[in-house]
Amino acid sequence: MAAKRVLIVLGKLKRGGAETLVMNIYRTIDRSVVQFDFVVHTPDRYDYDDEIESLGGKIYRFPQYNVLNHFEYKRCWNRFFAEHPEYRIIHAHMTGSASVFLPIAKKYGLVTIAHSHIA
């Protein structure tokens, strides 16, 4: 049986708090059962890109959300979910744009998790 793929949404794959937390979990999970794939909001490669790819994870790059690209951003997510029915779970670590993409994910039947790291 193939591993369940969970889509993790972050801003960048830098060595920040949320990113490091996710990577610590990712390194220790049984990736034959659960596999993390990532959506990031930058065209640039950062600290964890190579490690994620070496662990079998995919990285998808989205535009950074702002009010001026609201409708384009929504189209990107709709297109993504239409083209990737393999994802059943999305775990968002972004507070600002989660209100845009989580309802779209829900529309496509995904289980949604919104995780805030702001203290």
Regions found by a protein language model. Give the residues of each.
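Active-site proximal beta-strand in glycosyltransferases
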Residues: 6, 89, 105-119
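N-terminal strand-loop element at the rim of the active site
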Residues: 8-16, 20-72
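Gram-negative host-targeted secretion-system effectors, predominantly Type III and Type IV
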Residues: 35, 39, 102-103, 107-109
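Short, charged helix-to-loop "capping" segments that act as catalytic/coupling loops
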Residues: 40-44, 84-87, 96-97
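A generic structural signal for secondary-structure junctions
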Residues: 57, 82-85, 117
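An amphipathic, basic-hydrophobic alpha-helix
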Residues: 64-89, 99-107
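Short His-centered aromatic/hydrophobic patch
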Residues: 92-98, 116
